[in-house]
C-alpha cells in the first residue's frame, strides 16, 4: 500500500509539472519532487525536458545539494567535466561527507580514463554510503574498464552480497568468470547463489549456459527447465534448451522448445531451421521440408536455410532440385 501511494504521488507530480509547462503557470514543487521529475526525463532520454525541469528547480531551490548533484550528473553526461568538477569542489567544501560527491567525482575521472583514481574515490564513497551494492557495482565497472577481471569479479560478488536481486551484477560476475576461463568455478558460485535465491531465472539460465559450454547437456537441460518454470516466457532459455536437447538426441522435446519461442515472439529463421533439422532426424521428411521452406521465407538471405533444402534434396537423390537451391545459397 505504501509503495502504491508513493507511485501515485510521483505520477501526480509528473502530470502537475507537464500541465504547468502547457499552461505557463509556475507551480511549486519540493526539491525531491523535482529530482524525481528530472531523473524520469533523463531515463526516458528526454534531455530537453530534464533541462527545463532543472532550470525551474534551481530557481525554486537554489541551495539544494540534491538538485546541484543532478545538475552535475547532467554536466558530466554532456562532457562538461571542468564545470562539473568545479561545482563538486564547491559542494565538497560544504558537505565533505556526502557520498554522492565522491561518486560523481569518480564518474568524472572515469570519463577521463583515469579509472584507478575513480576506484580510489569510490572506495572513499564506501566509507560514507548506506547503499553499498550500488558503489560495489560502480567499482566493478571501473575494474572492467581496466581489464582487471579478477577484481571486477570480486566487486560484483560483493555487490550481490549486499543486493542479491541486482541482475546486472549477476550477469557481470558470470561474464568475469567466463572471461577468466573459470566456468567450473562460475557454476559453483551460481549453485551457492541459487541456494540463497532459488527463484532467480537468470541464475538458472546462466548455469545452463555454463553447463552447455562444458558439454554437460543433461545438467544444462535441467537448469534451462528450471529457468522456464520460473519464467514461462523466458524465450532465451527455451531456445538454448532446444539446443541442449538436440545434443541429447531428444528431438521431439527440442522441437517443443523451439516452437515455444515462436509462440512467445515472432518466428526466427534459426528456430525454424532447427525445427526442420529435428524433424529430419526423426525421419519426418514432409515436416522437415516444410520448416526449411519457412526458414528461407522468413530470411531469404540466410544461406544455411537454402543449404538445408539443398542437402535435403541431395539425400533424396533429387539432384536437379538440389542444384536450383544450391544456386540460391551462393
What are these regions (language model features)?
Residues 60, 93-95, 128-129, 162-163, ...:
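Structural marker of alpha-solenoid helical repeat scaffolds
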Residues 57, 90-91, 124-125, 158-159, ...:
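Canonical positions in the second alpha-helix
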Amino acid at each position: 500500500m505504501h509503495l502504491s501511494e508513493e507511485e501515485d504521488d510521483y505520477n501526480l507530480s509528473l502530470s502537475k509539472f507537464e500541465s504547468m509547462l502547457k499552461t505557463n503557470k509556475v507551480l511549486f514543487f519540493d526539491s525531491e519532487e523535482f529530482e524525481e521529475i528530472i531523473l524520469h526525463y533523463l531515463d526516458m532520454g528526454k534531455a530537453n525536458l530534464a533541462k527545463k525541469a532543472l532550470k525551474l528547480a534551481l530557481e525554486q531551490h537554489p541551495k539544494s545539494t540534491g538538485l546541484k548533484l543532478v545538475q552535475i550528473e547532467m554536466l558530466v553526461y554532456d562532457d562538461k567535466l571542468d564545470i562539473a568538477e568545479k561545482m563538486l569542489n564547491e559542494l565538497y567544501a560544504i558537505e565533505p561527507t556526502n557520498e554522492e560527491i565522491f561518486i560523481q567525482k569518480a564518474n568524472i575521472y572515469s570519463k577521463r580514463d583515469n579509472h584507478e583514481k575513480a576506484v580510489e574515490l569510490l572506495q572513499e564513497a564506501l566509507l560514507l554510503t548506506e547503499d553499498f551494492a550500488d558503489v560495489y557495482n560502480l567499482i566493478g565497472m571501473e575494474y572492467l574498464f581496466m581489464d582487471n577481471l579478477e577484481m571486477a569479479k570480486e566487486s560484483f560478488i560483493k555487490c550481490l552480497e549486499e543486493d542479491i536481486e541486482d541482475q546486472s551484477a549477476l550477469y557481470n560476475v558470470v561474464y568475469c568468470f567466463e572471461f577468466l576461463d573459470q566456468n567450473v568455478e562460475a557454476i559453483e558460485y551460481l549453485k551457492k547463489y541459487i541456494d540463497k535465491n532459488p527463484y532467480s531465472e537468470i541464475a538458472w539460465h546462466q548455469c545452463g549456459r555454463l553447463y552447455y559450454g562444458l558439454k554437460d547437456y543433461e545438467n544444462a537441460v535441467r537448469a534451462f527447465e528450471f529457468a522456464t518454470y520460473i519464467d514461462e516466457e523466458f524465450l532465451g532459455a527455451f531456445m538454448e534448451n532446444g539446443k541442449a536437447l538436440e545434443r541429447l538426441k531428444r528431438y521431439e522435446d527440442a522441437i517443443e522448445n523451439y516452437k515455444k519461442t515462436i509462440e512467445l515472439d515472432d518466428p526466427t529463421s534459426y528456430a525454424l531451421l532447427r525445427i526442420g533439422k529435428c524433424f529430419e532426424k526423426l525421419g519426418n521428411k514432409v515436416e522437415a521440408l516444410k520448416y526449411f521452406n519457412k526458414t528461407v521465407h522468413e530470411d531469404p538471405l540466410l544461406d544455411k536455410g537454402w543449404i538445408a533444402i539443398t542437402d535435403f534434396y541431395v539425400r533424396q537423390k533429387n539432384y536437379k532440385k538440389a542444384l536450383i537451391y544450391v544456386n540460391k545459397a551462393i
